[in-house]
Amino acid sequence: MAQSVPPGDIQTQPGTKIVFNAPYDDKHTYHIKVINSSARRIGYGIKTTNMKRLGVDPPCGVLDPKEAVLLAVSCDAFAFGQEDTNNDRITIEWTNTPDGAAKQFRREWFQGDGMVRRKNLPIEYNP
């Protein structure tokens, strides 16, 4: 039963934050790499604190052990200095997939009693 084992670690490149640079009158896209450094298959989902400004593609998926995925984090145009950006971040959530599950993401994996881990990547906006 996969759910009794806590999910292992993931690595992200960059490791601690995402930085966008001005000007903000056009859409920016920044790529981050997520690596499943554990020995089990995981399902992951990405959340953002500001759905209007920030997007992530693909927003969810499944990674085999040692597999990596490149995510495109996009920031839509906005009025820098006139909007609150202090709490902007993306959150990566991941959990072990059930034994024998197909390699297809399922939202239910996050709604049961299995352990879900999270990693926050704050967004920094340079003027």
Swiss-Prot record:
Its main location: other. One of its GO terms (cellular component) is cytoskeleton. It is found in: Cell projection, Pseudopodium; Cytoplasm, Cytoskeleton. Coiled coil: none annotated. The keyword Acetylation applies. SUPFAM superfamilies: PapD-like. Keywords: Acetylation, Cell projection, Cytoplasm, Cytoskeleton. Gene3D superfamilies: Immunoglobulins. The modification N-acetylalanine is found at residue 2. Residues 9-126 form the MSP domain. The keyword Cytoplasm applies. Pfam families: Motile_Sperm. Around 30 MSP isoforms may exist in C.elegans. Central component in molecular interactions underlying sperm crawling. Forms an extensive filament system that extends from sperm villipoda, along the leading edge of the pseudopod. This is Major sperm protein 78. It comes from Caenorhabditis elegans. The gene is msp-78.
